[in-house]
Swiss-Prot record:
Described purpose of this protein according to its UniProt entry: Catalyzes the conversion of methylglyoxal (MG) to D-lactate in a single glutathione (GSH)-independent step. Selective for MG, does not use glyoxal as substrate. Plays a role in detoxifying endogenously produced MG, particularly when glycerol is the principal carbon source. Important for viability in stationary phase.
Disulfide bonds: none
EC number: 4.2.1.130
Protein name: Glyoxalase 3
The UniProt record lists the keyword Lyase: yes
GO molecular function, one term: glyoxalase III activity
Active site: C136, H137, E168
Species the sequence originates in: Candida albicans (strain SC5314 / ATCC MYA-2876) (Yeast)
Length: 236
């Protein structure tokens, strides 16, 4: 059976100007989970510390409604059962996984770049011929992520996408990120020698596949990102 490591951010602190916390953006974990579940893949949720919290803005009706909210509210849904089995990345065997998927939320900007154990799983997956993927702010996992075989950044020379700088401006967090020395995904790409591909609009359903690296730009792209991961894995 194909095994997926679905990564969550551990960061769950005040971030937004309205005093709300960032953390895991619900649908950016839920949508990939459901795509992989329906495909019959086995999914393990993990974070760097074994803990997580939700992004406050991701649980409002604009972003969480309909069937998604039903799954979220059902304590017995497979998604919530999997959350109860959340693991600390260091407690897992990186060799067990075929796919790495980095879910998002601004929290990832704080912990993914230095999440050595999550990153070890990602590089191991890639080294064994699997797919490494992320959506929205999830590509923060690529910051400081080097291919152990070459010592070079894993995404060097690759094309990726992720949440746009314009999107950060619209959300009013650009200055907050600058004060915290947090890189935008475009800046991560530039730092690591990748080419950032920008969608026409910040809320477009938009993904980029470059070999075994698959990325998506925002919550609206989470389903397609996971679908593209499956396509990349099956073509591999």
């Amino acid at each position: 059976m194909v095994k997926v490591l679905l990564a969550l951010t551990s960061y769950n602190e005040t971030f937004y100007s309205d005093g709300k916390k960032t953390g895991v953006f619900v649908v950016e974990a839920l949508h990939p989970f459901e795509v992989f579940r329906k495909k019959g893949y086995e999914i393990q949720l993990a974070s760097e510390t074994g803990t997580f919290g939700w992004d406050d803005h991701s649980v409002v009706p604009d972003f969480l409604n309909g069937e998604d909210k039903e799954i979220f509210d059902n304590v017995n849904s497979e998604f919530n059962v999997a959350l109860k089995n959340l693991k600390k990345a260091s407690d897992l065997d990186p060799n067990d996984y075929d796919i790495f998927f980095g879910s998002a939320g601004h929290g990832t900007l704080f912990d993914y770049p230095n999440a050595k154990d999550l990153q070890k799983i990602a590089t191991t997956v890639y080294d064994k011929g699997g797919v490494v993927s992320a959506v929205c702010h999830g590509p923060a996992i690529f910051e400081n992520l080097n291919d152990p075989k070459t010592g070079e950044p894993l995404i060097k020379g690759k094309k990726i996408t992720g949440f746009t700088d314009i999107g950060e401006d619209i959300l009013g967090v650009t200055d907050i990120m600058k004060k915290g020395n947090l890189l935008t995904i475009k800046q991560v790409a530039e730092k690591e020698g990748a080419t950032y591909i920008e969608p026409e609009g910040p809320w477009d359903n938009f993904t980029v596949t470059d070999g075994r690296i698959v990325t998506g730009v925002n919550p609206q792209s989470a389903v397609k990102t996971a679908e593209d991961v499956i396509a990349a894995f099956e073509c591999n």
